[in-house]
Amino acid sequence: MIKLTQILTEVPSVDAKVCLTMVQRTKSRLRIVLEDGQDAGLLLPRGHILHHGSLLSTDDGFVVEVVAAKEQVSTARSDNPTLFAKGCYHLGNRHVPLQVEAGWCRYQHDYVLDEMLIGLGLQVTVENEAFQPEAGAYGGTTGGHSHGDAYDDSLEKASHEHAHGHPHKHEH
């Protein structure tokens, strides 16, 4: 299994790509399958959120580019800036991850939120699109706390298997 352990800022070339949903891009430990079918695992520093175009690397320099997967989202639109701001305010007040662009915003589909925004006067469309929420005011990490990132220690255990093929017990 390919073990992706580093987040890079730039590289001369990419060796593979992986398509991940927004929820998958919040995980630091996750088994994944690259677009070419190779098994891989994320063993990344905690607290980082991956974005479309993020670059990951193994310890030996194999580079993987992250592609934001299309997923079911709701897109709310309004030509009225005040109405649009109110809709974004109410979503933010509910701590909804939100992608904000000129005249529209996008969030993971939730019919209750859709109805709330329609009630405010926004137009809401359910779509299958890539979702790239705002990183937040603190620089794109989770701010040092978890939002349900279930820890998968099987990947960490796998990272302790060395070249001679058997696992060791390591104290942490």
Curated annotation (Swiss-Prot):
GO BP of this protein: protein folding; protein-containing complex assembly; urea metabolic process
Keywords of the record: Chaperone, Cytoplasm, Nickel
Chief location: cytoplasm
Molecular-function annotations in GO: nickel cation binding; unfolded protein binding
InterPro entries according to UniProt: UreE, UreE_C_dom, UreE_N, UreE_N_sf
Entry's Gene Ontology cellular component terms: cytoplasm
Sections of the chain in a coiled coil: none
Keyword Hydrolase among record annotations: no
Keyword Cytoplasm applies: yes
Places the protein is found: Cytoplasm
Protein function: Involved in urease metallocenter assembly. Binds nickel. Probably functions as a nickel donor during metallocenter assembly.
Membership in a protein family: Belongs to the UreE family.
Protein name according to UniProt: Urease accessory protein UreE
Record organism: Shewanella halifaxensis (strain HAW-EB4)
Lineage: Bacteria, Pseudomonadati, Pseudomonadota, Gammaproteobacteria, Alteromonadales
